[in-house]
């Protein structure tokens, strides 16, 4: 609990009113924001609703929230009749630019813009409105009250609707006093920080990112097995995959063993036998967990099997053949469903073809002959523990091994009567609010099969049973997926809020006990109730839908346009998710047609960088522009956000906007400009599709003032320099800029990018100007400069990495020392100062430079 309010704290609560609701108008500093506000809608100030003395927020955070509490308040509304789902307008607006985030699938959210309440999409998580009359911004965030969760929806005649739902026909309410939070600021980035800080103090059910520790893998390079193997993942493939990277000169510091390692079985089959020979995602989604340890593929692994000279080989061609057969099987399954629904006479023929393909798949698996399955009389270790121990023996730099699991165990939950837990098959019921979302295979399969739900009273045991075994087996963390399936099965369990609370509490306790309190990546979690209820301890999560290397619906251009869509998801979602979790931009494949496009964004994402390359399919030259030989990365010190001029634009299909995102390094800023045009959300078709007419070169501008220097305390001074050097990483160009300079003009080709590094110029004695840019062979050049000190008439610099170091210097140095030895350097008349830097393994790749003038 926070300390009780004293006179000092009380003085922080200002009484100035920003908002006013009267005469059916909701006003901001006297200017109407919403018109036609219904009589049953209320607005109450933050201080009249929130009880700071009951908050568990740290005193420093509490004081900050109280200092700007006058800038926020709550919408409420009342109905005469209680219900489990209540809908109400909160007023109408038109002619004002807004940015919003909406759920396009159960699990995923993305950006949307418009000018009126009717332009909103369903399941909107928040709306940020520009108020030009006051040169300010207002955000409206539907939140949680009592046992109800809320979201915004479009209404008729420019109205904004709010819907509050419990998810249970037994949990009803009629009145809400604080179902949505409203906040005002003149800075859109401050706005999001302040708003979520205020909600954190009010709800007391989650914590901000600044209050938590981030997983160790945040500044490292890793590999995820999903696109490399799908459900065929096994120890041999993982071992050879890691060995590939090692031989290529890059050491993954973490590996995520994705779906395919668990012990699942299907209803109607032997509950004690693992499902075998699964290939593609989708097949497993009706499967249920029947034991907490690894499946047969990993269970029979014998210690030392892959360490000796005669270790089993891995055949990537076999994987390719399996994928082709898996695709054939999937198409036949769809045809079978169509034949059943249409009562087609072709059904028998289709069934025959399915049997044939299944046999061919079984033959390709070949019985997984890398182990006899017979445990030797020698004292060998078997299973996951033996495997992780062998991985660490072979790959010394491997710090973390994570595994995948669904929030409810497996996609289909836990199979009743197979474990010690009280489990029940619960039919799935989707909220009406999800009707307008994109068709999703996972939703279809889970809904069809229902969910094996462990009774909420045993949620603690569910997670500890899984995680304690994993921790003992050498696993250091988990990627938890399918998080919002709980909302499908909450009717009998007190509704979506109460059920989620219990499950998230159990998950939190287990992460603390088994995985150092932070060994988790959240995924498929883009709904507001997860963030408001599930992030007390969880500090990292995905901020975009999956990396799709091609369009599953068959558009051949999807290989290109889907990548821009992914960047939009991640950039705009970070505006809100980044307040509570470290944004994770997901994996990509280094040999993909748009791999370089992805790599440019990952270079400045401020989080871990990981790929899902197939074994033997890598672009090591590209990877080495992102990753040091020791598997660490030159990480930005914040997470990237869209520049102000992109906030109310559509960088996907407006023909004119290049996505620009800004971030910080220790001694400078960076802006990435990405041409994502060519695709986007189609509200009529209710899916993402290509807009080929937009896939073209786009012009734009960039300026140093677009870096929001004041958003991090340690970088605020960098925004006050008289002059900056600007380095274009792709064009390899260098120029100077002041705060009053004209912006740099550019034209970005489709699915390409440019990275602009901005470094303050320092004047040394005699008027010499100097600024270190970093290693230009790395995409995030500025991230390679880890220490900088100006001493007398010179500079001392620590640089991590090997390659070509570049600085701006208005005059040629008299001497350049590298690691204590004088070295040759190149100085050009345009100010480019270059020197070659070796990677020194003994110094962890860090070199000391001294430059004398």
From Swiss-Prot:
Residues 1-11 form a propeptide. GO terms for biological process: oligosaccharide biosynthetic process; stachyose biosynthetic process. Keywords: Carbohydrate metabolism, Cytoplasm, Glycosyltransferase, Transferase. Its main location: cytoplasm. It comes from Pisum sativum. It catalyses: alpha-D-galactosyl-(1->3)-1D-myo-inositol + raffinose = stachyose + myo-inositol. Optimum pH is 7.0. Catalyzes stachyose synthesis by transfer of a galactosyl moiety from galactinol to raffinose. Also catalyzes verbascose synthesis by galactosyl transfer from galactinol to stachyose or from one stachyose molecule to another. Oligosaccharides of the raffinose family play a protective role in maturation drying of seeds. They may act as cryoprotectants in frost-hardy plants. Belongs to the glycosyl hydrolases 36 family. GO terms for molecular function: galactinol-raffinose galactosyltransferase activity. Pathway: Glycan metabolism; stachyose biosynthesis; stachyose from raffinose: step 1/1. One of its GO terms (cellular component) is cytoplasm. Its EC number is 2.4.1.67. Coiled coil: none annotated. It is found in: Cytoplasm. InterPro entries: Glycoside_hydrolase_SF (IPR017853), Glycosyl_hydrolases_36 (IPR008811). This is Stachyose synthase.
